[in-house]
Amino acid sequence: MRFAPSPGYVFLKEYPDEIIFQKIKTLKEEYIRRFECEPVSHRAARWGMNRTYFEQLDKNGILYDCSVTPLIDWTSARGYTENSCGPDYTDHPRKVYRVKGTGIIEIPMSVYMDHRFILNEGGNTSKKRNIKNFVRAVKGKKTLWLRPAGDNLIDLLYIVDQARKHHVDYLMFILHSSEMMPGGNPVFNTPERIEMLYENLEILFREISRDFEGISVADYGSMVGQKNLYVCSK
């Protein structure tokens, strides 16, 4: 490996193939030992996937992955070795697909473009802001995730509404366990913020439950795996 002058955090994909394989194998064996069941789904740290990583997951019997974030470019996230960075998923499929050359089914994160036009009233400043908002809405410059951020309940409900309108058959929700306790993360860092999170989740899940039901990545992957899915070589 050739190290960068001021390295960032390492991506697993930066290591040689054999080390990637052995790490996945070791973690899988430890998981089985502790929980007495075999893991079949995976998500990469920092969303850092590439072809080699997929191949090593496949060799270790992983069937489903959910690391792809459509519309998102992670190349600004530096790796540890020279010229290493995160992947660019801007043109990846937003629907479930098979990863070419492997037995893995990719279930991408729920990411949407925000085309809403929010009108501001009053004064020249608001007029300029309205023009800017309109351009952003038309071009779809803002991406929305189904991921709580403390002040984005309206965005989360918008995603659910868009999924319903476009007859999307799944929503991929993400929340780290560290985000469910005060002080475990910079966003929900107080008891009050945690309480607000749970209140928002109750509203969100109530809305989601109108058309969706909870299911694991493995169960959903097994269900859609019976279909004739698109094969992607990215």
Language-model segment annotations:
Residues 1, 107-112, 173-180:
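Short loop/turn segments at strand-loop or loop-helix junctions that form parts
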Residues 1-44, 48, 113:
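Metal-dependent polysaccharide deacetylase catalytic core of the NodB/CE4 family, i.e.
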Residues 1-3, 74-78, 179-184:
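Flexible glycine/acidic-rich beta-alpha junction loops that bind and position SAM and/or redox cofactors
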Residues 8-20, 38-44, 83, 142-151, ...:
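The substrate-binding groove and active-site-proximal loops of carbohydrate-active enzymes
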Residues 30, 34, 56-60, 203-207, ...:
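Alpha-helical structural signal in soluble globular domains
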Residues 39, 61, 168-170:
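A general structural motif
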Residues 44-164:
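Active-site-adjacent pocket scaffolds in enzyme catalytic domains
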Residues 133-234:
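C-terminal domain-boundary segment and adjacent tail
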